[in-house]
Design a protein with these regions (language model features):
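Residues at secondary-structure transition points
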Residues: 19, 36, 63, 88, ...
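Hydrophobic/aromatic ligand-binding patch that stacks against planar heteroaromatic rings
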Residues: 27, 100, 124
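Short secondary-structure boundary segments
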Residues: 7, 39-40, 112-114
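Short, well-structured N-terminal submotif of metal-dependent ribonuclease cores
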Residues: 1-37
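A generic structural signal for short hydrophobic patches within well-formed alpha-helices
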Residues: 10, 42, 54, 116-117, ...
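Acidic, PIN/NYN-like endoribonuclease modules and their adjacent C-terminal/linker elements
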Residues: 104-108, 114-142
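Active-site neighborhoods of divalent-metal-dependent phosphate/nucleic-acid chemistry enzymes
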Residues: 74-108, 120
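PIN-domain endoribonuclease scaffold, especially VapC-family toxins
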Residues: 27-83
Length: 142
């Protein structure tokens, strides 16, 4: 299965995390599945991991953050998506995530973000063969 996780899921995949997103990364990395990422997702994940709230939660050093990003790159196929038209009306910053899934021919966009579950976004994804799932839903299906 070809999977694009959004930034929040990628953040929760770090080595100090123990929830479903971390287990999802392990299944994808060591299974027949494919992780699809973009420079946008990698840069945003790195930036978010430095936020004070994330630092309080995970206490990742700069080296550990770099290792997390490098680890993601080592198991992912990187695509450079082109954002063609707005898809996520409530948060246009989410459009690069959608187009990473489209251009990477993903089957699943993994997210907990409500904006991705809006009917118009779901329909756009469906037209491109993409299902929107939470990390827990995706874990159950793998």
């Amino acid at each position: 299965m070809r999977v694009v996780p959004d930034t929040a899921i990628l953040v929760r995949m770090n080595a100090k995390a123990s929830g479903p997103a971390r287990r999802l990364l392990e299944r994808i990395a060591f299974g027949p599945h494919e992780l699809i990422l973009s420079p946008f997702l990698l840069e945003e994940t790195e930036r978010v991991l430095y936020y004070p709230r994330m630092q309080a939660l995970y206490q990742l050093s700069p080296d550990e953050i770099r290792e997390h990003i490098a680890g993601l790159v080592s198991v992912a196929r990187i695509v450079d998506p082109v954002v063609r038209e707005p898809v996520v009306p409530n948060d246009p910053q989410d459009d690069p995530v959608i187009y990473t899934a489209v251009d990477g021919q993903a089957e699943v966009l993994c997210t907990l973000d409500r904006d991705f579950y809006e009917p118009g976004v779901i329909e756009f994804c469906r037209k491109h063969g993409i299902s929107v799932m939470s990390d827990v839903e995706l874990l159950r299906s793998l």
